[in-house]
């Protein structure tokens, strides 16, 4: 059985036991997170939400809170002596999917 959930402005296909990386969620390591924005549940009998499946939830456990590798953002304007260098590290949350309840 699998499901498609919405979190952090993205849609992610998940299965039980899968490890996923999502945009940062509030919670400490070991906390249980419940997603109620389930768009689709697949398996023996597929359920499509309009826009979400009624009563369907996905539970996951927080494994890690971290930050991605640094990206360098560099801006410049030619002939104007304007240079700007900036770094960015996007925070993320690593989850392990426990169960899909439909």
From Swiss-Prot:
Pfam families: Ribosomal_L21p (PF00829). PROSITE patterns: RIBOSOMAL_L21. Keywords: Ribonucleoprotein, Ribosomal protein, RNA-binding, rRNA-binding. GO terms for biological process: translation. SUPFAM superfamilies: L21p-like (SSF141091). GO terms for cellular component: cytoplasm; ribonucleoprotein complex; ribosome. GO terms for molecular function: rRNA binding; structural constituent of ribosome. Belongs to the bacterial ribosomal protein bL21 family. This protein binds to 23S rRNA in the presence of protein L20. Part of the 50S ribosomal subunit. Contacts protein L20. This is Large ribosomal subunit protein bL21. The lineage of its organism: Bacteria, Bacillati, Bacillota, Bacilli, Bacillales.
């Amino acid at each position: 059985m699998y499901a498609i959930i919405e979190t952090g402005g993205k849609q992610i296909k998940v299965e039980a036991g899968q490890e996923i990386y999502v945009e940062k969620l509030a919670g400490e390591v070991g906390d249980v997170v419940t997603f109620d924005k389930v768009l689709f549940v697949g398996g023996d009998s597929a359920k499509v939400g309009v826009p979400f499946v009624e009563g369907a939830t996905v539970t996951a456990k927080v494994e890690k809170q971290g930050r991605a590798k640094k990206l360098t953002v560099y801006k410049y304007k030619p002939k104007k002596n304007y240079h700007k260098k900036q770094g960015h590290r996007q925070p993320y949350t690593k989850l392990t999917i426990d169960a899909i309840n439909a």
